[in-house]
Amino acid sequence: MNGEGTGIGAPTPALAGFLGKSKDRNASPGNCPWCLAKGQTNALRFYAVNLKETVLLCTNAVCLYPLVSRSLEEVRASLSKGGCKRSISSLPDISDDSCPPKRPREEKLDVLADVSEPCDAEVNDATLPDDTVKTQTFTDQQSAPAETISLDKTEEQPVSIEDIKEQPISHDATEGQPISIDQTEEQPVSILHTEEQPIVLDLIEVKPMSVDHSEEQPICIDNTKERPVSIVHTEEQSIVLDLFEVKPMSIAHTEEKPTSFDHIEEKPMSIAHTEEKPVSLVHTEDQHLSIDQTEEQPISIDPTEEQQPEELPAVSDEDVDLCERKEDCVSSTQDEMEEEVLESSSELVPVHSELFWKNEENMCWLDAMLVMLVHCRTIRGTPCRGIKLSDKLATVPCNDSVVWKLCWRYDKTCAYLQARKKQSEDKVLRVPAGVLVEAERRLSALRLSVFKLLQPTLKCEIGQQETPVFALPLLLRSDKWAQDIFQHTIRWEFKCTCCDFTVNESVEKTLTTLTCIVKDWHPLKANNRTQCNKCEHKNQRRKMVLEKLSSVFALHFVEGLPRKDLTKYGFTFQGFQYSVSTIIQYNKHLQHFVTWVRQSNGFWLELDDLKHPYSPTHKRLPFPSSEFHILFWETDSFKEEHSEVCLPTAPPEVPNAPDEHPPKLSDSVATDTCVISALTVEDTTASSIADTSIGSTTLLDTFEGLTHKDIVTLTLVNSESPKNEPRPMRPGFVSAPRHCPFEASNLLSGIPKTGSRLSTPPIPQKSSLVHKPEVAAAAVSKTHLQPTSLFQRHPSFQSTPIRPPPPLPPAPKPKPSLQYDKHEDLPVKPADMFGGFKTKKLANSQPKQISLPGGLNPSVKKTAGQEPISTTEALRLKLMKKLKAKKKKLAKLNQLLGNGGESVAKPDSTALSSPYSVTSSTTTYDSFDDQFLADLLSPATTVSNLSPDSTGLLEMLNNGQNGEQQNPAVATLAPEATLTCSSSTISPLDEYMQSGMCHTALENADFNSLDIFF
C-alpha cells in the first residue's frame, strides 16, 4: 500500500495499479464521490488484490469507500467519464514532510500495477483533484529517440516487459521525459501474485544488483558483474547511486514456506536488461541509497493498511530476534550513524546503578518476569554448553537458550553503559544522553523480541493485561535449558472426609499454583483447602509433597501468604537449603506487578517499572503478605546459610514453648549477667494469679468496693511442699549450671534499682509459703548472708512473693490468707487515698521470693528466735489478733446490752472518722456473731452516708494497738464503752503471734501510719 517506504532511500510510486484485465477500461479513478458529498476532495486509486483483480479505494484513511451505503453502480455512475488513457501522476517537487516516516526493518511492500492495454484518449487533468499526484503516462504510440520504452501488449497476453535495448531507465524527471518513472513516494518495488495466492518477496541479502533474462526461469533475477555504477547530476542535487545485487529471491507463500520463482506456473512477467546500458537513479535530498533488509523479515502487502491501527511498534535494527535465534544484521552505515549520534551528544546525564525496563504499553507483567530472570543467581551460575554468563568466554551468545541469550544481551547492554560512565565534579556518575537512550532502546528491543516469542502461544496483545503466571511457563517451555532449572516434581495427596475419594498423583511443573492455604503453611507441610471433585464437598484438605526440586523452586499464591516473615518459609530438602530470593508482588488495587530481589546483605531491591529509573532498597518489605504473588526459592549451601544475614522482614522468632532440646550454656556464659536475666524473666500474669498474701499495698485493695452485705472471712491455710522437690522452672527461664560460681553480693549489684512495686489484687485462691531444698540453702549460705536480709537490700524484691501453681502440697507453716465470699471485680480506687499505707523504711519491707537458677533457692523460716518479721507479715498478724480481740469484746458488749434490756443509741456513721463507718462487716465462725456484727457495724436506721472510703474498722484497730502499748492484754473497743479482757482469754495462737511481734522494730511506726486515713 502506498505511504510505506522501501528503506532504500529512493522515492516510491505514487499509486498501485493492477496487473490483470479491467472490464471497465474507460473508468477514471478521479475523486472519491463519498468524500465529494461531504465537501472533501480525495483521489481514488487502484490497488491489486492478485494478478487478475484490483480494488478501487479512496486515498483518505478515514473514508470507507466503497464500503458505504450507496450501491456500487451509483458510485460508478457518478464517476466522470474521460479518456481511455490512465495517468500515473506525481508532483515534480516532493517535500520531506509529505513523505511518511521511515521504518528500518518492518517495511511492507505495495504492488505497482500497470494498465493491461493503453488507450489513445488522454485523461483531462481537470477531472483530478488538486492534491492528486501528477505523473507522466505510458503509451505504446509515443516514441522518444533513444529514451523510450515500448510496451508490446495485447488483451490476451499478460503484462510483460520486453527486451529493453539501447535505452537506459532513468528516474530523473526533471527533463520531462514521458517514459521515465519518478518515484516520489516511499513505495517498494512490487509484489508478484499468482492466481491462487499472493507471492511475498523476501529480500535475503544486500549485494550489488543486476537483472538478467533467462528463458528457463523468466522470473528469476540472476546476478551479473558487468553492471556499472553511474552518477546522475542535476542542477539541484548530486546523487551517488549504489546498485546492489540481490541473490535469487524466494517467494513466501501464505503458509510461510519459502519457494522460488520457478514455482509460478503462468510466468506472467519477465524482466530483461541489456548488458550495455547502465541503470541510473536520481536520489533526492535527505534520502539514503542503501538497502537494509535482513534475512528474517518477510514483506507482505496489506490493502487496508491506512485504515488499520498499527498493533506492534517498529523493531529497530538492534532488535534481537529470539524467535528464530539468529544474529542481527546491522549495516556498517547504521553503525557509523550511531557513533556520530553518540559523539554529538555532549550532554551528560546521571545514571543509576540498576538498569531495567521502563513501563510502556501496560507491560509490567513482562517487565517483572524479565527482571526476575536477569537477576536470578542460579541462571547466571548454570553453564550453557559449558559457558557461564559470568565467564569471560561468554562473548558469543548461546543460540540454544532463549533465557541465556536474554541475560547475555542484558549484560552486554549494561557493559555498554558502564564503559561510558564518567564521574563529574560532584562525584556523580554520568553518561552522554545519547548513550543512555541507546541502552534503553536495546532493552526495549529485548522486551519486544520476548513479547513476539510469547504472542503465538499466550495470545497477548500490546496494551493488554497479562500475568507472569502464564507467561513464565510458556517461555520456559520453549527453552529446555532454562526449563530444567525451574522444573520440580510434586505429589498431591487428597482424601475426602465425606466420600473417601482419594487422589495421589505426581506432576511436573515449572510453576505451581496454590489457593486457600492454611495459616501454618510451610513448603514441607503444604496443606491447602480445596473441593472434592467427586462429591463437591468444600473445605477438604489437600497436601503437596515435594518429590524432586531443581535449583529454583517457584510457587504462585493466589491469596498471598499468611505470614510476612520469610525466614519461616526457608527449608532444607535433600541436603540443600532453600531460601526465598525473589518475590513478584501483585497490587490488586493498581493491578500492577513489581519485582523484589533479595541482595547479599539482606536488603530488598525494588524494581518497579513505574518508578523507572529509580530502584530503591528496603530493609523490610513495605507491603502486606497478602500481595506475595510469586515466590522463588533458590538453593544455598549450609555454610552460606549460617553466614548470611537473616532476612529483615521480621524479628527473630522467640519460642513460646519449651524445645525438645533445651539450650546448653557453657561455663564461660554463666556470668552474673545471664543469671540476672534468668531472674528477671518472671511472668507477671502467673505471679498475680498465684499471690494471695496480704501486703501493705494489697491491704486496702482487699476492702475496696465492698458493700454492706459482703462477708469477709479470715482463715488459716496450711500448705506444705516436699523438701526434696525443687521449684519447677518456667518455660521462659534459662537455667544456669548448678556449679555456677557466683556470689549473692554480685548478684544483687547487677540488678537495677527501682522503686516500682507490684500490686496484686486479691483472689479467692489458697497460697502457701514454699520451702526450698536444703541443698539450695546450703549453697547460698556460703556468702555468710541471711537470705532475708540479702533480698531486703533491693526494692525489686520488696513486693509480694510469687507463688507456684496450686497443685503443690501445702506446707506445715501456718499462713493466714484473706478470703471473701462474693467473687466480684472491685472498682478502681483513687491512688491518692492510700498514701499512708506506703512503707516508710525501704530496708525493712518484705523481701520478694524468687527462684534462683538451677534450684538455688534459700529456705526462709520465720520463727520467734530468728530475724524480725517484715512489715507485711507483721501487719497481717496484727490485724488477725486485733480482729479476734474485737470479736470477743463485741460479744461481751452484746451480753451487756441484752441483760440491761435497754436500747443503746447507735452512733451516726456519716463522719469518716467514726469507728462505725465501715464498708463491710466481719464475722466469726457462728451465725449469731455474724448477725450481731452486721447490726452493730452497719446500722440501717442511722447510716446516711456509707462510703467505700470509710475505714473506721482500721481506726478502731489502730486505737486498740495504742492501748496495747501499755498493756498488751487490754484493748479499746469504742468510745462509748471500754471493756477489759484478761490475758487468759487469749488463745495460745495469739500468744505465739504476740511473741513473734516483739521482735519487729516497725511495730509502732508502721501501724501509726494508718492514722492518715482517720
UniProtKB/Swiss-Prot annotation:
Subcellular location: Nucleus, Cajal body
Biased composition (Basic and acidic residues): 275-289
PANTHER family reported for this sequence: RETINOVIN-RELATED, SUMO-SPECIFIC ISOPEPTIDASE USPL1
Main localisation: nucleus
EC code(s) of this entry: 3.4.22.-
The organism's taxonomic lineage, starting at the top: Eukaryota, Metazoa, Chordata, Craniata, Vertebrata
USP domain ranges (all copies): 355-636
Entry's family note: Belongs to the peptidase C19 family.
PROSITE patterns in alphabetical order: USP_3 (PS50235)
Spans annotated as SUMO-binding: 364-631
The encoding gene: uspl1
Biased composition (Pro residues): 802-815
GO cellular component: Cajal body
GO molecular function terms noted in the UniProt entry: deSUMOylase activity; SUMO binding
Active-site residues, as the UniProt record annotates them: C364, H592
Organism annotation: Danio rerio (Zebrafish)
Keywords recorded for this protein, A-Z: Hydrolase, Nucleus, Protease, Thiol protease
Region ranges (Disordered): 137-158, 275-318, 794-823, 844-867
SUPFAM superfamilies the record matches: Cysteine proteinases
UniProt function note: SUMO-specific isopeptidase involved in protein desumoylation. Specifically binds SUMO proteins with a higher affinity for sumo2 and sumo3 which it cleaves more efficiently. Also able to process full-length SUMO proteins to their mature forms. Plays a key role in RNA polymerase-II-mediated snRNA transcription in the Cajal bodies. Is a component of complexes that can bind to U snRNA genes.
A GO BP annotation: cell population proliferation
Name by which UniProt lists this protein: SUMO-specific isopeptidase USPL1
